[in-house]
């Protein structure tokens, strides 16, 4: 019996895969996400610092002012601790932690291509910068400055500021995106898994179609 020979089938090269190459659209999406992140962070930071300046200028420390009756009050305090007055005796530790987290956010930001993740990191960055500015430049000294807190809800014992609110919202958004399986590129992880599994049968089919070599 004659031997049937077929040309060897070449495996697809990973280098030529368009999914692995940086396309202009992905680059544009990355730049757009960074712009959103920067705008959100700047807005949070400015709102936080402006409201703190207004409180310091118009209220005395410890003063309380009703804004929405018993629902929301202004209560000016100087907080040497973390968010919601946690750890008031370790201001310098929170300053170092804030610098470290801030550096991580800036280092990780270029990987973001999702609008939702950009908003998340913008809220986190703006909030961190707001409170870190207080710790670095307010009294009693550099790195141990007291954070200006002024918002109080009777249902909560803590007094906080807009930077704290932004950080809490970023954590809530993080939980939501994580539970939904949305990655930094905006894609769901299960959708990516489905794409990989749908590509596998094609490779198996090509292997099955390859004729066997028979010898006499």
From Swiss-Prot:
Biological or metabolic pathway of the protein: Protein modification; lipoprotein biosynthesis (signal peptide cleavage)
Biological process, per Gene Ontology: proteolysis
Cell compartment(s), UniProt: Cell membrane
Molecular function GO terms recorded: aspartic-type endopeptidase activity
Catalytic activity: Release of signal peptides from bacterial membrane prolipoproteins. Hydrolyzes -Xaa-Yaa-Zaa-|-(S,diacylglyceryl)Cys-, in which Xaa is hydrophobic (preferably Leu), and Yaa (Ala or Ser) and Zaa (Gly or Ala) have small, neutral side chains
Region of interest (Disordered), residue spans: 1-21, 189-216
Membrane topology: Multi-pass membrane protein
Domain of life, per lineage: Bacteria
TM segment ranges: 31-51, 89-109, 114-134, 159-179
Bias type Basic and acidic residues, positions: 207-216
Keywords: Aspartyl protease, Cell membrane, Hydrolase, Membrane, Protease, Transmembrane, Transmembrane helix
Active site feature: 149, 164
Enzyme nomenclature, EC number: 3.4.23.36
Record's GO cellular component terms: plasma membrane
EC top class named in words: hydrolase
Role of this protein: This protein specifically catalyzes the removal of signal peptides from prolipoproteins.
HAMAP family named in the record: LspA
Family: Belongs to the peptidase A8 family.
Record-given protein name: Lipoprotein signal peptidase
Organism of provenance: Leifsonia xyli subsp. xyli (strain CTCB07)
Lineage: Bacteria, Bacillati, Actinomycetota, Actinomycetes, Micrococcales
């Amino acid at each position: 019996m004659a031997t049937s020979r077929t040309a060897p089938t070449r495996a697809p090269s990973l280098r030529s895969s368009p999914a692995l190459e940086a396309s202009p659209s992905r680059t544009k999406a990355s730049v757009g996400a960074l712009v959103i992140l920067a705008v959100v962070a700047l807005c949070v930071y400015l709102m936080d610092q402006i409201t703190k300046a207004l409180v310091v200028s118009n209220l005395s420390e410890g003063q309380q002012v009703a804004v929405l009756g018993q629902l929301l009050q202004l209560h000016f305090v100087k907080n040497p601790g973390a968010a919601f007055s946690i750890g008031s005796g370790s201001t310098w530790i929170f300053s170092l932690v804030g610098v470290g987290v801030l550096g991580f956010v800036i280092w990780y930001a270029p990987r973001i291509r999702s609008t939702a993740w950009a908003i998340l990191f913008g809220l986190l960055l703006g909030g961190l910068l707001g409170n870190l500015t207080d710790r670095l430049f307010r009294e009693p000294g550099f790195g141990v400055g007291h954070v200006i807190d002024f918002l109080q809800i009777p249902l909560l014992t803590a007094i906080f500021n807009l930077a704290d609110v932004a950080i809490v919202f970023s954590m809530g958004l993080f939980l939501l995106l994580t539970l939904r399986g949305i990655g930094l590129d905006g894609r769901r992880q299960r959708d990516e898994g489905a794409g990989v599994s749908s590509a596998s049968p094609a490779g198996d089919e090509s292997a099955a179609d390859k004729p066997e070599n028979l010898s006499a």
